Structure formats: structure tokens, C-alpha cells
Amino acid sequence: MSELVYHIPVLLDESVNGLNIKSSGVYVDVTFGGGGHSKEILSRLNGKGHLFSFDQDADAEKNIEASEGFTFVRSNFRYLKNWMRYYGIEKIDGLLADLGVSSHHFDDESRGFSFRFDAPLDMRMNKRAGKTAADVVNEYDETKLADIFYLYGEMKNSRKIASMLVKARQKKTIQTTLDFITAVRGQQIPTNTMAESREKKDMAKLFQALRIEVNHEMEALKEMLQSATELLKPGGRLSVITYHSLEDRMVKNVMKTGNAEGKRVQDFYGKVETPYRLVNSKVIVASADEQKKNPRSRSAKLRIAEKI
């Protein structure tokens, strides 16, 4: 498996160590990407156990190398439970998820994930299905757009941005990343380095919001985490790397309470019930050395929990 053209795996040793791998166990990497984490897991199975790796992006298949005890599943990880049933797997020993968007996606101009390039406003992980980001910005009403930017981009001025988009699309269909940037920027051009930096951060949040909506990322994450909780054996490990507060909050909630909303369920005696024991009470972040070598690791947070 070669991650050279895709991305450098983040928190590689920390996340795989967190699985506490048994050489004969069954493991799942729900975010194959460049194959870096999968390759490390396979090296610790020594041909005795089995690894299932998921990725819905056809480009990820280019990184597959035939390996004993390895199965690649081209699918969204929200269908984890269905695929495990298909392969006759009732329980698993561990699951790893690196929820970051691969560098490959940001660097591929044709995918429309980055505001660095003028490209079709697509943003679909699976290019075969679903609405594009252009469909979202041209078809959703103003209220729905504002909600997306507020919930998924955490933009305080989401209503103003939505209003600007609606006015812009009345004059011209928004088809490219540059069309989108021009529409939400309006007439205001950064006048200094600080303003330019602030605008880049805002653009990153807006693009994040669109990407999450287009790919139904939060719904998919919720379903995957629910399936993982059902599939993990007692003593099985869940190792998840997050990159923004929305997904980190959901992962934290599931690990602490067993549900995505963070609702505490109590037994008859008032004791809070949870299916997990936290392995690390505080999030694990990349070392200064890793952050220097791989800047995308700066926002990464690793949480590990063990099924009770």
C-alpha cells in the first residue's frame, strides 16, 4: 500500500498502538485513504488476523496492494454494519478512523475541495452519487444555507453570507470555487496581512460546511460510531482522529455516554451507563516534530476508548 501520492498518515503510531492489536484479531480501518494506517495494522497482524478497510473514493483504490488477510470495501463507512454482516463478521477487535480529508483531495484541483484553485464546485467524496456543492449553493433556500454555514462552519454571520449567495446566484449560476468566493466576499478585498489571514480562515470554514453537507459527514459519522459500538467485542478498542470541533464533540460524546448527543443514561441505581472505558482521558495531539513535518496534523485530536 502506497500513501506517497495521497497523504502522510497522521498520529500513525499513537492511533495504531491505541488499538492494542492482537495478531489473530479482526480489525477495521474505516478511512483507508493512502493506506498508511492500514499498512501498519497489517504489519502487526502477521498474516494471522484480518483487516477490512473502507473508502468510498475510487481514487483510494490506487493505493491498494494485495496483502494476506486484507479486504478492501469501496463504500461509505456509514454502511459498516451491513458490510460486516455480508462478510460474516459478528464482532471485531478494533476500529480506527482518521476523519481528516486527505491531502490528495485538497491538492487535486478538479475536486473543488480547496479555495486555492478555481475548479468546478463539486466536493463529493464519491463522484458517482449525490448533489455537488454547486447544487447546494444554487438550489437551497436562504434559510437552509444559513443553517449549514452556522452549524457546520460555525460562522456567526451565516445569515449575511447566505443572503449574499442568493443575490449572487440570481445574476449568475455559481459553478466554480472562484464563483463562490466572489459571491461571499462581495466587494471587500483584504487590505493587509491580518485581514487576508482572517479571510482564509473564514473561507476554510465555509468550504468545510459545504463539504460536510454534500457528503452528509455528520450523519455518516453518527451511524458508523453506533455500528462500531455494536460490533466491538468487550476489550475491543475504538481509535478515532478528528480535525474539527463538530466531529470531535460527537466522538467524545459517544465514548463518554454511548450516544452522539451526549445524553447520560442512568441505571436503576442512578449510575451512568456507558459502553466504553476511556483509554486516554485527555486528547492526544501530534508532537511538535510531526506538526513540523506534516502541517495537516496540527489540528488532529486522537481519542481512544475500550468497549466494556
Question: What positions do the PLM features span?
Answer:
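S-adenosyl-L-methionine-dependent methyltransferase catalytic core, i.e., the SAM/SAH-binding region
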Residues: 1-308
